[in-house]
UniProtKB/Swiss-Prot annotation:
Residues 1-214, 285-379, 470-525, 563-898, 956-1080 are annotated as: Disordered. PANTHER family: LD36051P, STRESS RESPONSE PROTEIN NST1-RELATED. This is Stress response protein NST1. Residues 76-86, 151-162 have a biased composition (Basic residues). It is found in: Cytoplasm. Residues 1-19, 187-196, 770-780, 1067-1080 have a biased composition (Pro residues). Residues 50-61, 87-96, 811-835 have a biased composition (Low complexity). Residues 865-877, 983-1004 have a biased composition (Polar residues). It holds the Pfam family NST1. Residues 118-127, 330-376, 488-518 have a biased composition (Acidic residues). It comes from Chaetomium globosum (strain ATCC 6205 / CBS 148.51 / DSM 1962 / NBRC 6347 / NRRL 1970) (Soil fungus). The keyword Cytoplasm applies. Residues 201-214, 470-481, 590-630, 637-745 have a biased composition (Basic and acidic residues).
Length: 1255
């Protein structure tokens, strides 16, 4: 603490000498595991050593004391110095007189062993001191180096707190001042006890310099170097240190004092190095000089050491005599520090890379901790030279006998002590670490340490001066802020020095006078100190060079050993590879033998297999030959059969053609004959009609005159009666009059002629026409014949009596003479229904009616209206004979089965049953829309789903459906087989049935009331009727869903026999054998007007042929004429065969075409299945399938272009030209080929020939 002159002793220190041995001292390690005993002269104990201050302890905590440490004894300082000096001289004499081992001086019992056995692992065992592994003890100037006046206790305390910096003004460029700065608070440790070699050193003996062989090798290495190589090892230091010092000080303070400080450092370093080089060179020239160190003359550069003032330094510092007393550092933790130093030595030696122990952080921490210490009150009595000596003492030089290459003056130099404060007593790590810093870091840390020491020294001088002035009342009372105060007067300094010396004398209570050192001794001491420093640096460089050489040798040897090992490995691998190859060869030979054996067995087996296969092939060939021969025979037989069949087929076709030709000729002859007869009959009829017309005109004239008279009388009576009942019956008369007018209009329209030929109507007599009653009674339905069983209830329909007509149809000449009123009434009633359409331009159609009940005269009332029109086929379809055979009665008035066709229909007695006469191939009569039951078939009773009330023609198809009465395949058959040709006897009154769809009539007389003509799609006027004129093209109207279709959506229209779209309505088909009723007429015993057609036929809704001639059904060959008998069709009996699903004609023809191609390809007619077959052969085959009815080649080619699917047989047809104008066809089966559906010839179904158009 500040001002504490007598602090308590440090907690740890060297063990005092035992009382039995006064000349020895025992030092132990911190943990007591190591101890060493050294002579007492080597371990002088300063009794006046101060304890560290609180700040220094805070900056660097003291290590715990060892188990045997005690506070040191307090001895007289002056006596201690004298004893140390004597001991140093004695040690020097002993070193000179003792025998050298291998040219080396005998080491002390502690230092040599300590330096050799420095423990590098204590840094790990004691982490508390690991960062101070390179620390060195601070050796200050002691009594052994001169007789400088002793210092007071204050001065010693000040030196202890600032032990890192010298007291003098020597700058901080000394490389070994780093130990002073970094470890100033650390106590001086005793040398550690001997230790065993570490395992690392045993593993790397290359760095072990303890053995005699190693020393000999180092010596030989040194002696083997040339002069230039030796100089190169030691010449580097001076230039490197000076260069680095200049670089580091370029940016420092540029004041005069700092400049002088730098100059002094450079000069001192240069002088020291020059002196050392001269002595080293002298030693090199005289290597065996071992008598004492040569004493060189003092140089100019050593003047500062001897108290001379350096250049530029004030006289105050030069006049001051350096103190003889040395500043002793703390003794606390001596043992530990010695061990740490030893560890640093070994670390530095064992590491090739020379790891630097000093770190910049540690340097800064130590620097700050020292700067933070409060300056003590003691004054520093040292000057520039004394600081340099202190710096020299801080250079830890150890193991001077390590290497045999040092000069003899250094080897035999007698140090003043070998203990804690001796130069060679501490670890080698310090000097070697500083040397490593110079070698590896270019002395950067060394230069920084010297600068820091210089700065702190100047700061301490400033503080000391300030404290001195405050303590002793400076007369001027001046305070200087700058770190370089002006030098005080010499007189004042002398007074202060005297007072300080007095305080020292009083404090130590020692009457002895301090010894004084001469200038020459100080110079010699400083020179020797630097020589030791330089020698250790030189030793480090030699040792480093030797290590590098040994490392290279060891590396080369290691490479040789590695190469030898590689060769051995290669030989071993080669041997293994050879053995493996030998084994592989043996295995390969064995495998080859096995393969040969296996090949032999396989060859034998293959030979057997080949023989067996040859035998099998021979047998297969024989079987193939037999099969081929059999196939050829079968093929020849099949060809013969096919040729025979084709010949027969050709013969049959020829016969068919001949028969058709004969039939055609016969038909043409019959048609010509019939035409001739018809022409004759027409001529006769025209003549007869002309005569009748004249008679009728005459009678009509008479009748008209009679009626006029009667009418006049009647009009008078009626006028009279009307006048009487005018008021009462005015409304009723008006209504009756309107009805009369309406009836008159209807009668006029019914009696109007088809062709407006001017005729003269004779008046009828009054007796021939009964007078009309004033009030028309409501008539009832006429009495029906009991021979008709009507399933419907008759409904009475009110009707007015007919108005008188201006004309009356004349009775035919074939009628009986009796003209009963009932017959006339029946005739007039039937005549009223001849024109159901009231429009005047509607042509008159024959109104078919049912067979009327027998009249009184025994003649069936089938309509007996006479025809007085010209022979241009007017409304009367044909002329029936006046007298008919009496009917054959049966229950319900139905003719017996088979008797209806025993005689031809009226007017067709000359026709053959088959209607093959050419006359009926032409539209001779207008189409009769009525219906007549066939022979053996029950006629339709009135009201039993027949043609319908007041409708003797079939309904036209709905809009969009094709077909009609004009599209019947045989219109003449519809005319010939219509049952009621003259009358519609179902209604006794003359009312027009609603829903009439008759063609329009030519223009006639205007009538009061007229209805617009009914326009029905698909119905056209007769193309042969003279009243309608020539046929006019009518654009086809698209109605219903057909209006939404495009014109092309209806498919090919020109295909013969093609069914139109929508040709079949949903519903069940009729049983085979029943005829298909026309559209609008229900089938018998059915009430579904939309019953579907039973078979596919070209005309779906038109009138059908007679039931005995079955329509196009499954039993009718395609294109078969109407005159041919059906194969097995019955009129009203069981069907000839089972019905089958109906398919379109194009599908059936395509299937037959495919079947024909396949049959011809399989029959061998072509070269193969992929060959083309001529179209003529295919056509013949298809006609054979079609029962000989011809099919056009163009139709076949068109069908070939259709795409195959699962319905029409699949596949496709290829058509090519054979180059001669012919075509050939080939069928190619597709991926989704379906099995062809064979045509069932047993049922007699064929789609029909395109030529026939499906007739």
């Amino acid at each position: 603490m500040k001002g504490n002159r007598n602090p308590p002793p440090p907690p740890s220190g060297p063990v005092p000498p035992s009382p039995t041995s006064k000349n020895t001292a025992k030092y132990t390690n911190k943990d007591g595991s190591k101890f060493i005993t050294v002579p007492k002269m080597n371990t002088p104990i300063d009794s006046a050593q101060p304890s560290p201050t609180a700040s220094s302890l805070a900056a660097k905590p003291a290590l715990p004391p060892g188990p045997e440490t005690e506070p040191p004894q307090t001895v007289n300082r002056k006596k201690q110095k004298r004893r140390a000096k004597a001991a140093a001289k004695a040690a020097a004499e002993r070193a000179q007189n003792s025998p050298a081992i291998n040219g080396l001086p005998s080491p002390s019992p502690t230092n040599d062993q300590q330096s050799a056995d420095a423990d590098p692992e204590d840094d790990e065992d004691e982490p508390g001191t690991g960062h101070d592994s390179g620390n060195q003890s601070l050796y200050l100037n002691g009594g052994a180096h001169g007789g400088a006046p002793g210092k007071s206790k204050k001065s010693k305390k000040k030196k202890k707190k600032n032990a890192t910096g010298p007291a003098g003004g020597f700058p901080n460029n000394n490389p070994y001042a780093q130990d002073d700065r970094d470890h100033s608070p650390e106590p001086i440790l005793p040398p550690p006890p001997p230790q065993q070699n570490r395992p690392g050193m045993s593993r790397e003996k290359i760095w072990n310099t303890n053995s005699q062989e190693e020393r000999e090798r180092i010596k030989e290495f040194w002696l083997g170097l040339s002069e230039a190589e030796r100089k190169s090892l030691v010449k580097v230091e001076k230039d490197a240190v000076l260069k680095k010092m200049k670089e580091q000080q370029k940016h420092t303070c540029s004041c005069t004092v700092c400049g002088r400080k730098r100059t002094a450092i450079e000069e001192e370093l240069e002088g020291l190095y020059d002196a050392y080089y001269e002595e080293l060179e002298q030693y090199a020239n005289h290597p065996n000089q071992g008598e004492g160190p040569p004493m060189l003359r003092p140089r100019r550069s050593f003047g500062s050491m001897g108290g001379m003032r350096p250049r530029g330094l004030h006289s105050r510092f030069s006049n001051h005599q350096p103190s003889r007393g040395r500043i002793v550092d703390e003794l606390e933790g001596d043992e530990e520090e010695e061990e740490v130093e030893a560890e640093a030595e070994d670390d530095g030696e064992g590491d090739e890379e020379g790891e630097d122990v000093y770190s910049e952080d540690e340097l800064e921490d130590d620097m700050y901790s020292e700067e933070e210490q409060e300056p003590s009150e003691e004054l520093h009595r040292s000057d520039y030279a004394a600081d340099f000596f202190n710096f020299g003492n801080s250079l830890t030089v150890q193991g001077r006998d390590r290497l045999p290459i040092l000069p003899s003056f250094l080897q035999n130099y007698p140090f003043s002590g070998t203990g804690n404060n001796a130069y060679g007593s501490s670890s080698l790590g310090g000097i070697l670490t500083v040397a490593d810093d110079l070698l590896k870091n270019d002395g950067k840390k060394f230069i920084e340490m010297m600068e820091q020491l210089a700065e702190r020294r100047m700061a301490r001088e400033e503080d000391a001066r300030g404290q001195f002035e405050r303590a002793y009342d400076h007369p001027n009372g001046e305070r200087y802020v700058h770190s370089h105060p002006p030098p005080p007067d010499e007189e004042e300094f002398e007074d202060e020095e005297e007072e300080y010396e007095e305080d020292d004398e009083e404090e130590y209570n020692s009457p002895d006078e301090e010894d004084t050192m001469t200038e020459e001794q100080r110079m010699e001491e400083g020179r020797r100190m630097f020589q030791i420093f330089a020698a250790r640096m030189f030793e480090q460089r030699v040792l480093t060079a030797y290590r590098e050489k040994v490392a290279k040798e060891r590396q080369a040897k290691l490479l040789e050993e590695i190469e030898a090992e590689n060769q051995q490995d290669a030989q071993r691998k080669a041997k293994k590879a050879k053995d493996a190859q030998r084994r592989k060869d043996r295995a390969a030979k064995k495998k080859e033998a096995q393969a040969e054996e296996k090949a032999r067995r396989e060859a034998e087996k293959a030979a057997e297999e080949a023989a067996r296969r040859a035998e099998e092939a021979r047998k297969a060939e024989e079987q193939r030959a037999k099969a081929e021969e059999k196939r050829k025979k079968k093929e020849a037989q099949r060809k013969a059969e096919e040729e025979e069949r084709q010949r027969k087929e050709a013969e049959r076709l020829r016969k068919i053609q001949d028969r058709e030709e004969a039939e055609r000729k016969a038909r043409e002859a019959r048609e010509r004959e019939k035409k001739t007869r018809e022409e004759a009959r027409l001529r006769e009829k025209e003549a007869r009609e002309q005569k009748e017309r004249k008679d009728r005109e005459r009678r009509e004239q008479q009748e008209r005159e009679r009626r006029e008279k009667e009418a006049k009388a009647k009009a008078e009576r009626e006028a009279k009666e009307a006048k009487e009942a005018k008021e009462a019956k005015e409304g009723k008369d008006t209504k009756e009059r309107r009805k009369k007018e309406e009836r008159a209009a209807h009668k006029a329209a019914a009696l109007a002629p088809a062709i407006p030929v001017p005729i003269t109507l004779p008046k009828r007599s009054a007796t021939q026409q009964p007078p009309a009653p004033p009030v028309a009674p409501v008539p009832v339905l006429p009495q029906q014949s009991t021979s008709y069983a009507s399933p419907k209830v008759p409904v009475a329909t009110p009707a007015l009596p007919k108005a008188p007509t201006p004309m009356r149809a004349r009775q035919t000449s074939q009628q009986d003479g009796s003209t009963a009123s009932s017959g006339a009434a029946s005739n007039s009633g039937s005549m009223a229904s001849q024109n159901p359409s009231p429009h005047p331009i509607t042509p008159v159609h024959a109104s078919p009616g049912l067979m009327a009940p027998p009249s009184k005269s025994g003649v069936m009332g089938i309509g007996s209206q006479g025809s007085a029109q010209p022979p241009s086929h007017s409304a009367s379809p044909m002329s029936f004979p006046a007298k008919l055979l009496p009917p054959q009665h049966s229950p319900f008035g139905i003719p017996p089965m088979g008797s209806a066709m025993s005689y031809p229909p009226p007017g067709l007695s000359q026709m053959p049953l088959g209607f093959a006469n050419p006359l009926h191939r032409e539209p001779l009569f207008p189409p009769m829309p009525g219906f007549r039951p066939a022979s053996g078939m029950m006629p339709m009773p009135p009201g039993l789903n027949g043609p319908g009330v007041n409708r003797g023609f079939p309904l036209h198809p709905p809009p969009g459906f094709l077909g009609g009465p004009m599209e019947s395949p045989a219109p003449s058959m519809a005319q010939a087989m219509s049952p009621g040709l003259q009358r519609d006897n179902q209604s006794p009154h003359s009312r027009q049935g609603s829903g009439s769809f008759d063609p329009s009539q030519p223009i006639s007389r205007p009538t009061p009331i007229g209805r617009p003509a009914s326009v029905v799609q698909g119905q056209r006027p007769s193309n042969w009727s003279p009243s309608s004129g020539p046929p006019k093209p009518e654009p086809e109207a698209h109605l219903g869903s057909r209006a939404l279709l495009d014109d092309l959506d209806d498919g090919p229209q020109d295909f013969p026999g093609r069914l139109s779209r929508g040709g079949s309505a949903p519903g069940p088909r009729p049983a085979p054998g029943f005829p298909m009723p026309p559209f609008g007429m229900d089938p018998m015993f059915s009430h579904n007007p939309w019953a579907p057609p039973g078979v596919v036929q070209p005309n779906l809704f038109g009138p059908h042929p007679p039931p005995s001639f079955s329509p196009l059904s499954a039993h009718t060959p395609m294109g078969m004429p109407w005159g041919h008998a059906m194969p097995s069709a019955s009129t009203f009996g069981t069907p000839g065969a089972v019905d089958r699903p109906i398919e379109p004609r194009s599908v059936a023809v395509r299937k037959m075409l495919r079947r024909a191609c396949e049959d011809l390809a399989n029959a061998g007619s072509a070269e193969g299945r992929d060959s083309f077959i001529p179209l003529e052969m295919i056509k013949v085959q298809v006609e054979n399938f079609n029962h000989g009815y011809p099919i056009d080649e163009k139709d076949l080619l068109d069908i070939c272009e259709t795409e195959g699917n699962e319905v029409n047989g699949g596949g496709s047809f290829d058509v090519v030209n054979d180059g001669q104008g012919g075509r050939s066809i080939r069928f190619v089966s597709g991926d989704q080929r379906t099995a062809p559906q064979p045509v069932q010839l047993a049922v007699g179904y064929n789609p029909g020939s395109p030529i026939g158009g499906g007739r």
